[in-house]
Amino acid sequence: MRLPLPLLLLFGCRAILGSAGDRVSLSASAPTLDDEEKYSAHMPAHLRCDACRAVAFQMGQRLAKAEAKSHTPDASGLQELSESTYTDVLDQTCSQNWQSYGVHEVNQMKRLTGPGLSKGPEPRISVMISGGPWPNRLSKTCFHYLGEFGEDQIYEAYRQGQANLEALLCGGTHGPCSQEILAQREEL
């Protein structure tokens, strides 16, 4: 008997899938969250790199969408947004509901998951915990970057490419995705 994925998760995340000759057993369980992950108003330190990458992705997506609608090309023929427009777009990015993001566990390590975050091999099946404190934490993280760098600097980095935007927000020697910070995260 084959069950759709939501039913598999509902019935303990165990099922036998595949064709008649090649049966594969898959199982998944929800990540076990510690008190900080459950109750803190702030993004836990070990998830800040993922959160930063999610924010950079959403900013880039929304700015690109706004530029596609714009009718004001710059000297190179690309669409350039007015300051008031990109300020509004970035503010709306941070104010969105962030419901498509959550936390799951990969190789005994908790990671944020959602649009713009898949890097490396993903598990064949996993359980994501979304809602709860995660949308508010991502919104706060987004507004933190707006305050730290400002809309002008963020838009300028975006105009140089998505990689530059992510480097501005997440890189640097003390950024959440710096090698030093990631090494400390792995030690935990």
From Swiss-Prot:
UniProt keywords, alphabetically: Disulfide bond, Endoplasmic reticulum, Secreted, Signal
Chief location: endoplasmic reticulum
Signal peptide start-end: 1-20
Keyword Disulfide bond: yes
Localization per record: Endoplasmic reticulum; Endoplasmic reticulum lumen; Secreted
Locus of motif Prevents secretion from ER: 185-188
Annotated S-S bridges: C49-C177, C52-C170, C94-C142
GO annotation, cellular component aspect: endoplasmic reticulum chaperone complex; endoplasmic reticulum lumen; extracellular region
Any matching Pfam family: DUF3456
Gene Ontology terms describing biological process: integrin activation; positive regulation of cell population proliferation; positive regulation of immunoglobulin production; regulation of B cell proliferation; regulation of cell population proliferation; regulation of insulin receptor signaling pathway
Alphabetized PROSITE patterns for the sequence: ER_TARGET (PS00014)
Post-translation changes: Forms an interchain disulfide bond with IgM monomers.
Keyword Disulfide bond among UniProt keywords: yes
InterPro entries per record: DUF3456, MZB1
Entry's family note: Belongs to the MZB1 family.
Function of the molecule: Associates with immunoglobulin M (IgM) heavy and light chains and promotes IgM assembly and secretion. May exert its effect by acting as a molecular chaperone or as an oxidoreductase as it displays a low level of oxidoreductase activity. Helps to diversify peripheral B-cell functions by regulating Ca(2+) stores, antibody secretion and integrin activation. Acts as a hormone-regulated adipokine/pro-inflammatory cytokine that is implicated in causing chronic inflammation, affecting cellular expansion and blunting insulin response in adipocytes. May have a role in the onset of insulin resistance.
Assembly and oligomerization: Part of the ER chaperone complex, a multi-protein complex in the endoplasmic reticulum containing a large number of molecular chaperones which associates with unassembled incompletely folded immunoglobulin heavy chains. Interacts with HSP90B1 and PDIA3 in a calcium-dependent manner.
Name of the protein in question: Marginal zone B- and B1-cell-specific protein
Species whose genome carries this gene: Mus musculus
Gene for this chain: Mzb1
